[in-house]
């Protein structure tokens, strides 16, 4: 069961991150992407106030599964993902900085595009 959970977490978590990073591209997915980015920020900074900054329940649960499988994982899922995909082993501080900068960038982009889309929709409806 754990090997299947490991793969499931890897697919789900990676898809969540990819959607956070790219979901703003398509107008129809922007509200959903803004919601997933907001949930991510709420986890990192809301739950993070109690469990440690950058806390992600998905990472926590995935690490529990991987520990039972005998894996010795880095502190950050981003580190694991980059290592698995590219073979590059990032330092923890660099991985954290990269994650925060990307989250801040896509959050700003999402809010600006969402507001622009809302204004355009209201302008169209008022005509």
Q: Can you say where each PLM-predicted feature lies in the sequence?
A:
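Hydrophobic transmembrane alpha-helical segments in integral membrane proteins
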Residues: 1-17
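Individual transmembrane alpha-helix segments
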Residues: 6, 82-117
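Aromatic-anchored segments of alpha-helical transmembrane domains
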Residues: 11, 41-50
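Hydrophobic, membrane-inserted alpha-helices
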Residues: 15-23, 42
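Structural signal for membrane-spanning alpha-helices in multi-pass inner-membrane proteins
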Residues: 24, 47-51, 110-114
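Membrane-interface helix-boundary motifs at transmembrane edges
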Residues: 24-34, 119
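Cytoplasmic juxtamembrane regions at transmembrane-helix boundaries
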Residues: 35-38, 106-127
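Extracytosolic (periplasmic/ER-lumenal) interhelical loops and adjacent juxtamembrane/interface segments
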Residues: 52-95
